[in-house]
Regions:
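Structural recognition of the beta-strand scaffold that forms the well-ordered cores
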Residues: 47-52, 78-83, 105-109, 115, ...
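Second-shell residues forming the walls of enzyme active-site clefts
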Residues: 40, 80, 89-105, 115-117, ...
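Active-site-adjacent structural elements in enzyme catalytic domains
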Residues: 87-104, 137-155, 350, 355, ...
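Catalytic loop of the DD-peptidase/beta-lactamase superfamily, centered on the K-T-G motif
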Residues: 567-636
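Short acidic, glycine-rich surface-loop motifs adjacent to enzyme active sites
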Residues: 46, 68-87, 170, 246-269, ...
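Preference for extracellular/luminal or secreted protein segments
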Residues: 19-70, 284, 306-570, 574-575, ...
């Protein structure tokens, strides 16, 4: 009986967790009804709009506070989305506009790598493709939790993350490294863990981009991508993670701008504007009950065919709840009212969506909104980010090939050269190699001519080991990630040397250019933390544990990765939780035994020296037990 009750309780908990943002109580119903009754018809429509709060104009970041303030006062808009700027500036703006809002604003952010993706003063967390290289799903949960804590601290209620598109097209110009990889099971597991981490902190996650943006070759910011797969193919791959996100209780989903004839044959109509996709497939067939956000309606994948507010109307007809960045707010409201008069929509449709949004606002804590505390804000947002980021890097770094067993770990006694490709001078990786190996450094960038390149190749012949670092290439695959053919040819000449090892710092898809390397490591990102992890791998104090989250070429498929050798570290006894005096006694006994000049080998147990290995979790009493197990002659 107890077991049955426990199972029922567990199922209830999972279901309740999935509906945490849409639970109705007498208190929530009272707040929703009160807020709803204050809204005019124009304001009801505006409650469904997400407005941009900042923009980049040239080199400058411009806060649109005056415009947004006008929208709040005139229309009582429902939501804003944060983009560029610093945390302190953003928080100041949010405090001011929340103070004048008649209905509290739902604050959103497009923060796939945390708020550091948008705030200049906050360190971003790892890219999702880097996370896809690790094996520990609990680490994905902790990343989600860290992002949730950041969002809460700076007054954000909804984060447009994670990306759960399966990136099965290496040339994808818009998703690519933003994905968790190409395996639907891993994408689903890690995506659901990130969601749970965020939502456990009371921040609504948003799985994107439904019904799957991973297999495109056109950027939807610039045009409308077309996917010609059958419904069966979509169901078996692209839709799989989204089904799992629904089971995991994700609070919202973002709808992609794609043209998929298998879902809707209306020519040039994006899936974000398709009733068959949003209402028919997502809500009715898959049973999703959370909020739906359109992808940004200012993107050309939509505006090319539905300009000047018409995209907003069609998004609502499709069944979306929230319209992200509609651009022409006044025109969107005007055309929505016109669509209602034409019976394309009803006020009941609008009212239902507004009630849903208000209920989410209540459950996100907007009924008791407090100002964001500015002091120590930046410090709080950065707290423990580098520690968590380093842990991800340590679990992600991937050894793909090791033809020369002596190159890894690399002895500090070797004569070492470092060749930085893509940089003109020393970076953190170069400085660490100089510090740890006294490495001589050479650099190859777009200013290096063929004569200089030949001289570098010639000079490298006198070294015991040559370390190659591939740096500062672009994250997206256009124009071969910005990697020049001359750089690829130069690297190839070095990589054919048995004593060379290549570290590729960035998008792993670029490894196709360096896959002939005799010794090869995928590093995923190009920052000082990853540089330090890579040097520790060279030294043997860090093990390569990662696996490729995507297929790179015929040599390196999804899941490729070799566990590297790791040297037993020398640590201070106190660090390992041990009593140094007892260890010194063991050393003394062992040295006396070894220096006695007597052969104690044999079967007599009183001359047996047992070498006992123990972890740093050994309890203090065990140390005395170790002493008691060492039997030596009393006269030694």
């Amino acid at each position: 009986m107890k077991k049955i009750i426990l199972i029922i309780f567990s199922l209830y908990t999972i279901t309740a967790s999935g509906q945490q943002f849409f639970q109705t109580t007498p208190a929530s119903q009272k707040w929703v009804d009160k807020s709803f009754k204050k809204l005019t018809r124009k304001q009801k429509i505006a409650q469904l709009m997400v407005v941009r709060l900042s923009d980049r104009r040239g080199k400058d970041v411009v806060f649109l506070e005056p415009e947004v303030t006008r929208y709040i006062k005139k229309y009582d808009i429902g939501s804003v989305c944060l983009f560029q700027g610093s945390s302190i500036l953003q928080a100041g703006v949010l405090n001011r506009i929340q103070a004048i809002a008649k209905t509290p604003l739902m604050v959103c952010v497009d923060g796939e790598t945390g708020v550091g993706m948008r705030f200049a003063d906050v360190v971003p967390l790892p890219d999702q493709l880097t996370i896809g290289a690790i094996s520990d799903a609990d680490l994905a949960y902790r990343i989600g939790k860290a992002i949730g804590l950041q969002c809460k601290r700076v007054g954000i209620q909804v984060n447009y993350a994670p990306v759960v598109d399966i990136n099965n097209n290496p040339n994808n110009p818009v998703i690519n490294y933003r994905s968790l990889g190409e395996d639907k099971y891993k994408v689903s597991l890690f995506g659901s863990n990130i969601i749970k981490g965020m939502q456990d902190e009371g921040v609504m996650a948003c799985a994107k981009h439904f019904p799957g943006h991973g297999d495109v070759s056109v950027d939807s910011h610039l045009d409308l991508p077309i996917i010609t797969k059958s419904m069966q193919a979509l169901d078996s791959l692209e839709l799989y993670p989204f089904k799992q996100m629904i089971k995991a209780g994700v609070g919202s989903m973002m709808i992609a701008h794609l043209y998929i004839p298998a879902i809707d044959t209306i020519k040039n109509q994006a899936t974000s504007l398709s009733r068959k996709n949003v209402t028919g497939l997502l809500k009715e067939t898959l049973g999703f009950k959370g909020l739906t956000f359109t992808d940004a309606l200012e993107m050309k994948g939509v505006t090319k065919f539905y300009p000047a507010g018409q995209a907003s109307v069609q998004s609502l007809i499709a069944g979306n709840d929230m319209l992200c960045l509609p651009g022409d707010l006044k025109g969107s409201i005007k055309k929505t009212r016109k669509a209602i008069r034409k019976h394309q929509l009803t006020w009941n449709d609008i009212d239902e969506k507004v009630h849903k949004v208000l209920l989410a606002k209540y459950n996100l804590g907007l009924d008791t909104l407090k100002p964001i505390l500015i002091p120590s804000l930046s410090e709080d947002l950065n707290k423990d980010v580098n520690k968590l980021k380093k842990e991800v890097y340590e679990n992600a770094i991937t050894l793909l090939r090791q033809d020369n067993p002596s190159i890894l770990p690399l002895s500090a006694s070797k004569k070492v050269a470092y060749v930085g490709i893509g940089i003109a001078g020393p970076n953190h990786f170069a400085r660490l190699l100089q510090e740890n190996y006294k490495a001589d450094c050479f650099y190859f960038d777009n200013t290096t001519d063929s004569i200089q390149a030949r001289k570098i190749i010639s000079d490298l012949q006198k070294y015991d080991a040559v370390i190659v670092g591939i740096h500062q290439y672009k994250k997206f695959p256009a124009n071969n990630f910005g990697i020049a053919k001359a750089a690829v040819n130069f690297a190839d000449k070095i990589e054919k040397m048995d004593n060379s090892i290549s570290f590729v710092f960035g998008n792993p898809y670029a490894i196709k250019n360096f896959s002939d390397a005799r010794n090869l490591v995928a590093c995923y990102e190009d920052d000082s933390l990853m540089h330090a992890v890579a040097v520790n791998l060279l030294k043997g104090t860090q093990q390569a544990k990662g696996r490729l989250p995507v297929t790179v070429d015929a040599d390196f498929h999804y899941g490729s990765g070799i566990l590297s050798k790791v040297l037993f570290p020398i640590v201070d006894p106190k660090t390992a939780g041990l009593d140094g005096t007892i260890l010194n006694r063991i050393d003394s006994l062992a040295n006396n035994w070894e220096n006695s000049g007597t052969d104690h080998r044999g079967t007599d147990p009183k001359y047996e020296l047992r070498y006992i290995f123990f972890s740093n979790r050994v309890c203090p009493d065990s140390e005395n037990n170790i002493i008691s197990q060492i039997n030596v002659r009393s006269d030694i």
